[in-house]
């Protein structure tokens, strides 16, 4: 373990699996005390915490639906009560939808925006008042916002909203020395990414990157950890595309 984040408390939304799990584990390995958030995956969240504890880190699992103000409030309240004042917020919770725009239902549209945009809005709104001065926020977007891929219109719309909200929020939080940045992964080898894809699809997307492979959750986690750290203290209001040279 390193001491990069020693004494810091981090909330990572949607961290029971995939990229979120990797971010939580990475921060814990660098001495942060981590809130592993899940909505319905209790067993998976507990497994992530158990693995962190086995490796000598500090973490607890917190059930909270960040699509609601009550859920976001619960997340911060439990973190503060159990681990102390919060220094870092990582908004990783998200959903994806592959459908031509004309086929997307109103319910699907609302559901996707509730997770990807409203969840980020609600936690950032709380962070504006409750994150410790000098803290750091990283919101997850996607490199697909620049690819204009058919069937991605609704998903990309949610991530574009997150990016623009983050850029402006960074300016608003400057007075408290709180940095706000975005990380936009490219195709990353996770359960969410692989859902509904054939091996041919996976290989085709891997070859789109200059480095000719899919990213791993650990690739993204290391970028997020760096952005949160004091080493990135002059990086603010930026969108870091971690995609192996995809775009």
Features from the language model and the residues they span:
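Conserved glycine-rich Rossmann-like NAD(P)H-binding loop of the short-chain dehydrogenase/reductase
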Residues: 30-47
